[in-house]
Amino acid sequence: MTTPTDQQPDANHYLRHLCRLNDTQEVTASEDIYNQFGVLLIAKGSRINPQTQTQLNQHRLKKSLDGQIALQSTLTDELIFQRALKMLEKSPELWSLHCSNRFEAPFRHLCLSENLPLQVRQKLTVMDVQLPDLFEHCLFTGWAAALIAKEIGLKPDICKNAYTCGLLHDIGLLHISADVQTPLSEDNWRALQSHVVIGQRYADDCGLEKSIGRGILEHHERLDCTGYPARKAANKLGLLGQLISSADLLHSLCTNELSRSRHSMHDALPYFKIHRGSFNEAIHSAIIRLLSRTTSDQLDQDTDIPPVNLQRVRDTNIQLKALWLPLLELSQQASICAQPEWLKVSTMMVSIIGILNESGLDDELLSSWLITEMDLDDQANQLDLKEIDAMQYELLWLFKRLGWNLQCLIDAHETPESSASTALAAYHTQLNEQLEQAFSRYLEPKQPSPSSLHEQEQEQEQEQAPPSQQQLANAENAKNAADSDPKSATLSE
């Protein structure tokens, strides 16, 4: 079976971006471009237009295309910094978080002392023009990753690498077809995983520190083995990937669920509580501290926020229990098989069991409270229901990710027919049916193009705009390779 690491970067999609950019500014060959056999394809100074695109598409190049092109106008470190500030200033909460944590001077220093290579700034320029939403997502991720690193107390050079890694973490999406990025089906999810491999290779080819390339590769991995592309064990993961992963998820929350329902960043706390096992303790604690310093008081108190759908909370709680109950036995059956993919699926199941136990969503007292008659005008009840609804929604996506991995395992045919494989296949069928029903409760009739929550699984459906201009990863993501991170439903309360 083809894995993400087997796939080669697709220059065709990137060439399309360059051709479109050539409509607004000159994009030329900075040197003679040869194919792998040394045959001249494009002479130095030639414009990258549809004619040269066709010529280049027919050959494997001797060198990477990125090192052989020149843009008439390229982002500078100062311009990237100013764009990041503009992005923060658009949100009073983000700007307040930036200033209250005294991050103005440190952020300016790490942005302007970075001296990003020309090749990197050119790539970011292409992203800025062709995929502006993705570029803003990368600005946020670089800023947030550096802020979290500072909150932890990491050294300035690590904060700087976190910023750079965040800027480039989704650079591989320039090489991925927009058709793959949305909607995020099982097949598209597999293809999308290659963007982290492409991004790592690009960072390494640009001469950036190896830790940056590794961070790009691992930014959709999770400590509980629920990520991709390799579902590495916790002791095999580096720090940068986990910093980017957490920043990726934060952006997905802020730009999708929380912004649409006029909630504050403080309301992201339930989501990160669910993902406690996904990040190391230092990163998780830093995020909780940062979010705890924000406040919902900045919301317009005169605007009515729709109450939580109580019946949805009740029904979802029942379904989550039905999906959770078979996991322990299934995880034990899967662990008996010595093959790595089976063990990873078993680990994912155990992780979900632990998350449910820690969240208290499986508690009988909670179930009893949910079915009682309650005063929905009571603010305390609404706050509790809002947090429960948010956590349950995240758990549904953990089950969704489990389903994708089960499908990969089933398709791999790694073991002969057995009681364990039969049980997993039956559970996979049940899981898909239950999730389809559960997610349908979150669909907004007036929003036919629901946005995703992640990474990573981290993209947004944008039917009103040309795909070449507005596609996101979203995420995780991706923001949901990431979870970074894309989703088929939006949370409406």
Question: How does the language model describe each region?
Answer:
Residues F37, M87, A144, I198-G199, ...:
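A general alpha-helix detector
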Residues L243-T255:
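Conserved beta-strand-loop-short alpha-helix elements that form
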Residues P50, L65-K210, N235, L299-D304, ...:
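Acidic/His-rich, divalent-metal-binding segments that scaffold phosphate/diphosphate chemistry
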Residues N188, I198, T255-L258, K273:
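Phosphate/pyrophosphate-binding active-site loops
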Residues I176-S177, C225, T255:
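Active-site-flanking alpha-helical
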Residues H454-P486:
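Compositionally biased, intrinsically disordered low-complexity segments enriched
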Residues T2-R102, S367-Y427, S451-E455, D483-A489, ...:
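Membrane-cytosol interface segments
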Residues G166, A203-S245, S259-H263, D267-Y393, ...:
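Histidine/acidic-rich helix-loop-helix segments that form or flank divalent-metal centers
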